[in-house]
Amino acid sequence: MSKLSLSSLDKSKLEGKKVLVRVDFNVPLNDSGQITDDTRIRAAIPTIKYLINNSAKVILAAHFGRPKGKVNEKMRLTPVAARLSDILEQKVNLTESCIGEEALAKSNSLNNGEVLLLENVRFYEEEEKNDLDFAKNLASHADMYVNDAFGAAHRAHASTQGVTKFLEPAVAGFLLEKELKYLQGAIDAPKRPLAAIVGGSKVSSKIGVLDSLLDKCDKIIIGGGMIFTFYKARGLDVGKSLVEEDKLELARNLEAKAKNKGVELLLPSDVLLANEFSPDAESKVSQIDAISGDWMGLDIGPQSIKVFQNALAECKTIIWNGPMGVFEFDKFAEGTNAIATTLADLSSFSEVCTIIGGGDSVAAVEKAGLAEKMSHISTGGGASLELLEGKTLPGVAALKDA
């Protein structure tokens, strides 16, 4: 689904226009209210700067946290406005509310090239209900709409979908355009062989993705805690490892489907066990058919790392979603770090397209300092998963077709 983007609009028509830009500024804060990671803010800068440089009046709409439709002083966008002002090196004013007279007066008094941040749209319950009156009020700030919030594109909310009924044109920003190009491109027209690495602790959260990827991939590598549900389904003893007892039949079906479709499904042959769930746990490597007693698997083993690396070396496109083990514990981060390093090397030296599909795998790549070496790092968790599942994202579907 090809959508009109900001880059395809006539630059001269942006001058003096009030542009409502939906951004994803849902950043983590520490206990003293300071931003600990501004990646999402920085990801929106190309779109914001482009509008500033083309003399538009920029009005930003964003959500923060889950205030449940009520004003929550801890979820105001004050720290975001301050950080954005620093990055842009110009003052970004914040409204007291995203709609109403005060906000409208501020958006109407903007000069060309100025930026206004509307207060948290989720302070109104109408936002998540996609209420059209609320959407119309939001739209009244502007002449046109840009969605650059990939992380919220899977939500049919007033600021992602409803506003498009009142603003024309409604187009994709640079970040959203890039996300769609890589993620949609990897699914619709990848360079082959295409491999997906799916990790994480639960099969249940990745069922849709695994099922969808079996129709598209040449190889699927599975790691993380979910491997033990597959092993248990094969009748193996997994000790005290995490298992979803109600998903055993599903695991069997996924393995059978892969076999029928000729997709190479790779599970680890060895794992790193721990005697307790702790960063300082005693550990040992075990073959998957030799796990017993009180031990639990917290990472993939060295033999599996080599097998996975060899399998990935044959691929031209690789999508990674979910860690190989409990990478938050250094002792059990080897599998995840090895995959991150392998992808960085393949991307740098072999022109392999490497896509890190949101969530914990992004955190793992950033922790390893390898983010810059990947072809694309997705800013969306749930949105990435839904796109990989082949679902239509409401915030994207609402935009003007190219």
From Swiss-Prot:
PROSITE patterns: PGLYCERATE_KINASE. It comes from Prochlorococcus marinus subsp. pastoris (strain CCMP1986 / NIES-2087 / MED4). This is Phosphoglycerate kinase. Gene3D superfamilies: Phosphoglycerate kinase, N-terminal domain (3.40.50.1260). One of its GO terms (cellular component) is cytosol. GO terms for biological process: gluconeogenesis; glycolytic process. One of its GO terms (molecular function) is ADP binding. Coiled coil: none annotated. Pfam families: PGK (PF00162). Keywords: ATP-binding, Cytoplasm, Glycolysis, Kinase, Nucleotide-binding, Transferase. Pathway: Carbohydrate degradation; glycolysis; pyruvate from D-glyceraldehyde 3-phosphate: step 2/5. Monomer. Belongs to the phosphoglycerate kinase family. It is found in: Cytoplasm.
